[in-house]
Regions:
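ABC ATPase NBD coupling module
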Residues: 2, 15-31, 55, 60, ...
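Conserved ABC transporter NBD signature motif
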Residues: 6-14
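Conserved ABC ATPase "signature" region
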Residues: 13-14, 50, 54, 61-78
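Short coil-to-helix segment of the ABC ATPase nucleotide-binding domain corresponding to the Q-loop/switch region
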Residues: 43-50
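Conserved signature/switch motifs of ABC ATPase nucleotide-binding domains
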Residues: 82-85, 102-103
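Catalytic Walker B motif of ABC-type/P-loop ATPase nucleotide-binding domains
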Residues: 108-111
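Helix N-cap at the start of a conserved alpha-helix in ABC-type nucleotide-binding domains
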Residues: 119-121
Length: 269
């Protein structure tokens, strides 16, 4: 599709829609995972994964080696000869991920890749993507409406509103600083939260220590884990306004990441 204005840059190289050869070459470097799996029902797991390489004219030996490697990577070795109609949603998405990796792309684009899955299956797919990133170093771009997906797997995030970039940055910093765009997205029901804190470890002990040391009344509005290892915890809390500055000083001394929050009446500021 053509766009009205701007440029498309991949690895610093501008890609022109009019330059079909450039677009064709870059397609080999981008793998795509869709929400609805997009598997060919008449082909089995092995054949679905092999399809891109066959289309590009690779030898049978090259295809067999790569496909078996990827089937092992997505943990579907026992489903090699199965057809899509006999697979669960999670298994279908694993096949789709393997197929997207056949051409050894530099970028894996996941468009709502977990939105059609139940929470447990979604978590297993996110873990698989994280493992693939760790093992191969591939860049993974995730398009999602579920903030939990972004929070669990992404190191950086961007929020789009009406076609414009509303906010971006490191995931942990965006969730802590809670810009207006994120708060609109989250649609918080409470307007009392005035402090955002990220604990890297022992979150319950550190929070209890702060409450004890400062003699605080703390209302925990929200608590969310960040990252697949669940070690980093983000708290959104309300503390008495007269204690807010003291809390910030205490957290700074402990080298704990924290940020003041504005009231919801300022959400559009």
């Amino acid at each position: 599709e053509k766009f009205d204005s701007g440029k498309i840059l991949i690895d610093g190289v501008e890609i022109s829609i009019e330059n079909e050869r450039a677009v064709r070459n870059i397609r080999r470097e981008i793998g795509m995972v869709f929400q609805n799996f997009s598997l060919l029902e008449r082909l089995n797991v092995y054949e679905n994964i092999a399809f891109p390489m066959k289309s590009w004219g690779y030898s049978k030996k090259e295809i067999d080696q790569r496909v078996k490697e990827l089937i092992g990577l997505v943990e579907l070795t026992d489903k090699m000869d199965a057809y899509p109609k006999h697979l669960s949603g999670g298994q279908k998405q694993r096949v789709a991920i393997a197929r997207a990796l056949t051409m050894e792309p530099k970028i894996l684009l996941c468009d709502e890749a977990t939105s059609a899955l139940d929470p447990k299956t979604s978590e297993s797919i996110l873990k698989l993507l994280k493992d693939i990133n760790d093992k191969t170093g591939i860049t993974i771009i995730v398009v999602a409406h579920q903030l939990s997906v972004i929070r669990d797997i992404c190191t950086h995030m961007a929020i789009l509103e009406n076609g414009y970039l509303a906010s971006s940055g490191k995931t942990i910093e965006v969730f802590v600083n809670e810009p207006a765009a994120l708060r609109r997205l989250q649609a918080y029901k409470s307007n009392e939260a005035n402090l955002s804190i990220v604990f890297q470890k022992n979150h319950s002990i550190e929070l209890s220590q702060m409450i004890r040391d400062l003699n605080l009344d703390v209302n925990i509005i929200d608590m969310q884990h960040i990252g697949m290892d669940k070690k980093t915890v983000h708290y959104t809390v309300h503390v008495p306004n007269e204690k807010l500055e003291t809390c910030m000083e205490w957290l700074e001394k402990k080298k704990i990441y924290a940020s003041r929050l504005k009231g919801m009446e300022q959400i559009d500021a």
